[in-house]
């Protein structure tokens, strides 16, 4: 017990109950070092027997590591927000998630936020008021006509960068933060995607170089809205070391291939969606199943019920722009009906 108290001065306590393993998305309350010192000092020695084991590690839990390193910037990115359930869940939880996860900068993909197709100015404003610094999109960006005029005057509402020159709106933005400049690029893939756009590989590389050279942005985040895993992985490999993160969207299914490439670029094929869980990609599953069984066109309403919030947390060294950590984010909740 004395050894535990001694080592605790240079680390934190990790409590491991061998009787059960917490699920990956379970919230873990992190206690600061001083609080743990007090806890252990008054903890009976006999309580350290049996299935209850104590391990000592240097530093805080991963979720709090960034607090002790002033050069680290933590980005939270949330995948495609689907319909009213998805946006209500995100708006209701975003500020709390920011605090719980020690987030510095928030990006959300809002491309399905309006009844599952596109986004409206009101929804975009609501998401920004909730804490989103930038909203990205994809192939459904034009589904709500009123968003066109809004994009002309709101550079934080992005459409894919690789639309032809002269297209209304912005495909990228650089924002100043308390930890330096952060660049965000939104691009759309070409494989199995409509409409066919300009080459995203060339467009993203050119824009990332411009951001670094002309605007001094070291931290650059790319939302690559694409269908195939091969195109997404190729994009990440193509610009490894040039940007801080390449995170895929569009498929609505969170993948488990998070990694940091050799050049320092964090990567995940798809962040997943923020939308109804009892569904097919956020839509009521029965009409989708019937469409597959009969080939008869049907409407696919946004589903209801439990909602999942899916995304990713990326830690970046603000001085070098290199990613130092990446972790999937996953949270389920019940929405109260009005």
Task: Map each language-model feature to its residues.
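N-terminal helix-forming leader/targeting segments
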Residues: 1-8
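N-terminal start and proteolytic maturation junction detector
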Residues: 6, 45, 54-58
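Hydrophobic alpha-helical signal peptides and transmembrane signal-/tail-anchor segments
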Residues: 13-16, 52-61
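Acidic, metal/ion-coordinating pockets
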Residues: 69-338
């Amino acid at each position: 017990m004395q050894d535990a108290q001694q080592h605790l001065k240079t680390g934190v306590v990790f409590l491991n109950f061998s009787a059960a393993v917490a699920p990956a998305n379970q919230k873990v309350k992190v206690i600061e070092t001083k609080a743990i010192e007090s806890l252990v000092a008054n903890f009976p020695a006999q309580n350290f027997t049996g299935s209850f084991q104590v391990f000592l590690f240097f530093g805080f839990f991963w979720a709090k590591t960034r607090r002790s390193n002033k050069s680290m910037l933590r980005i939270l990115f949330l995948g495609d927000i689907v319909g009213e359930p998805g946006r209500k869940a995100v708006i209701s939880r975003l500020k709390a998630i920011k605090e719980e996860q020690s987030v510095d900068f928030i990006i959300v993909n809002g491309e399905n936020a309006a009844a599952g197709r596109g986004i409206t100015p009101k929804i975009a404003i609501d998401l920004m008021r909730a804490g989103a610094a930038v909203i990205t999109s994809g192939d459904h960006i034009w589904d709500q006509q009123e968003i066109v005029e809004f994009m002309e005057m709101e550079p934080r509402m992005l459409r894919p960068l690789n639309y032809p020159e002269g297209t209304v709106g912005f495909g990228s933005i650089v924002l100043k933060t308390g930890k330096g400049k952060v660049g965000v690029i939104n691009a759309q893939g070409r494989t199995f995607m409509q409409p066919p756009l300009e080459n995203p590989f060339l467009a993203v590389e050119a824009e990332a170089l411009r951001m670094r050279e002309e605007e001094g942005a070291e931290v650059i985040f790319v939302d690559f809205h694409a269908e195939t895993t091969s195109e997404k992985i190729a994009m990440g490999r193509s610009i490894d070391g040039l940007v801080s993160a390449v995170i895929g969207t569009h498929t609505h299914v969170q993948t488990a291939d998070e990694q940091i490439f050799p050049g320092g670029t964090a990567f995940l094929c798809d962040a997943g969606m923020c939308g109804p869980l009892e569904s097919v990609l956020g839509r009521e599953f029965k009409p989708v199943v019937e469409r597959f069984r009969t080939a008869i066109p049907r409407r696919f309403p946004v589903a209801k019920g439990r909602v999942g919030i899916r995304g990713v947390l990326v830690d970046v060294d603000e001085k070098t722009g290199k990613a130092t950590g990446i972790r999937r984010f996953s949270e389920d909740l019940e929405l109260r009906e009005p």
